[in-house]
């Protein structure tokens, strides 16, 4: 009897681990167009809210996760560096210097909530250090 319960428990645990918990966080594909759109929105939001004279660009994506939550929640962990473009200027050709100083590199966790049927993107968390 106990052996059947243990086997059933292990089987359920294995299924949940391999498929993930419904509504739980899962790794996202950085190359997905919706993920890219949310990341661009997150960086634009950061640049709009910061007091930096120059814009920042993502230099490294550390982790991207997504979660179904009345839409899609994207959680980005990224490194951002100061680019060569001042805020308010044309940003199409901004480059990140080859050897940025350590003070110019920040790591951010930015959460974007997407509700495509409402044409809505919203930053719900923005923590940088």
From Swiss-Prot:
- Spell out the SUPFAM superfamilies in the cross-references: Cystatin/monellin
Q: Name one GO cellular component term.
A: cytoplasm
Q: Which Pfam families match?
A: Cystatin
Q: Which cysteines share a disulfide bond?
A: 85-94, 108-128
Please give the SMART domains that the UniProt record associates with this protein: CY (SM00043)
Modifications the protein undergoes after translation, according to the UniProt entry: Proteolytically processed to produce two chains linked by a disulfide bridge.
Per the Swiss-Prot or TrEMBL record, what residue ranges does the short sequence motif Secondary area of contact cover? 67-71
Site positions for Cleavage: 91-92
Give site residues, Reactive site: 23
What subcellular locations does the record give?
Secreted
Record keywords, A-Z: Disulfide bond, Protease inhibitor, Secreted, Signal, Thiol protease inhibitor
Coiled-coil residue windows: none
Domain of life, per lineage: Eukaryota
Q: Where is it expressed, tissue-wise?
A: Detected in ovary but not in all the other examined tissues.
Annotated signal sequence range: 1-18
Keyword Chloroplast recorded: no
Read off the PANTHER family from this record. CYSTATIN (PTHR46186), CYSTATIN C (AMYLOID ANGIOPATHY AND CEREBRAL HEMORRHAGE)-RELATED (PTHR46186:SF12)
Q: Which family does it belong to?
A: Belongs to the cystatin family.
Q: What does this protein do?
A: Cysteine proteinase inhibitor.
Q: What is this protein called?
A: Cystatin
